[in-house]
């Protein structure tokens, strides 16, 4: 949010460059996007048919990247993940560590944010699947 130009350079223009290059060599592009392309204001889980409505720079820049892929590349898969967790430091492990730490007396979290945590190993398995299939 503090550097929108950089966010767009990486998430939109950088993604456009990858899409153009993938198309030029006939490669399949597998893109990891985010659930931040949605507003988060609906009372249901989002799916690929819901209309994107990002509320922050990150989501807007990632959505712009998705649009570039759809415009410039004919073989692509867009995977939208949220709260990726696995071995190492990530949001979910940070919260779990804080909950287990007896020296932490208070933990403040949003009561309005809902997400579906994504296992890093499961995400890797899905990426491998899309690499191998020929339909995309």
Regions found by a protein language model. Give the residues of each.
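NAD(P)H-binding glycine-rich loop region in Rossmannoid oxidoreductase-like domains
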Residues: 1-10
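Short amphipathic alpha-helical segments
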Residues: 2, 19, 43-44, 90-92
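Short acidic donor-binding/metal-coordinating loop in glycosyltransferase active sites
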Residues: 4, 34, 81
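Conserved cofactor-binding/catalytic machinery of classical short-chain dehydrogenase/reductase
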Residues: 6, 14-17, 28, 50, ...
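Conserved Rossmann-fold NAD(P)-dependent oxidoreductase catalytic core, especially the SDR/UDP-sugar
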Residues: 13-55
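Active-site Tyr-X1-5-Lys
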Residues: 24, 53-79
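NAD(P)-dependent short-chain dehydrogenase/reductase
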Residues: 67-129
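Short, hydrophobic alpha-helical segments
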Residues: 131-135
